[in-house]
Amino acid sequence: FAPRLLHQAIDLYRNLYRPSAAWPKPYLAIGVPLIAAPTDEEAEFLASSTYQRVLGILTGDRRLLLPPVENYAARLQPQERAAIGDFLAAAVIGGPETVQAGLADLVRETGANELMLVSDVYDPALRLRSLEIAAQAHAALQAAVPA
């Protein structure tokens, strides 16, 4: 998990990698913040919990995950929105199609072998649904890859 320095961390890892018998090539696993919902709009609403958490991390006001807030991003100062966006640069937030495209783009951009997803959704049932949508997106991506 190196959200703001993801590409630099990947370059450093690959440049300093030393092959071994067990791992002749680098194996890249990256952490990805993910919020998935049936629609992009609902995912953005649910992501407001993550935005609140990130802002708390950045300002030293750490708390337990808070419930989502309607139009949370609109209430923020431009520099707060920018800081949250920077922190979550590798995040994938959206409905099924957006998530599928976002995961595919992230793998293409990074060459990741594995994605470790974290879904900070306040409601546990909706968190599970978020991960189920991500699993469906992954399955669709795998089905599209030629054997």
In which residue ranges do the predicted regions lie?
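Active-site-adjacent structural elements that line small-molecule/cofactor binding pockets in enzymes
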Residues: F1-A147
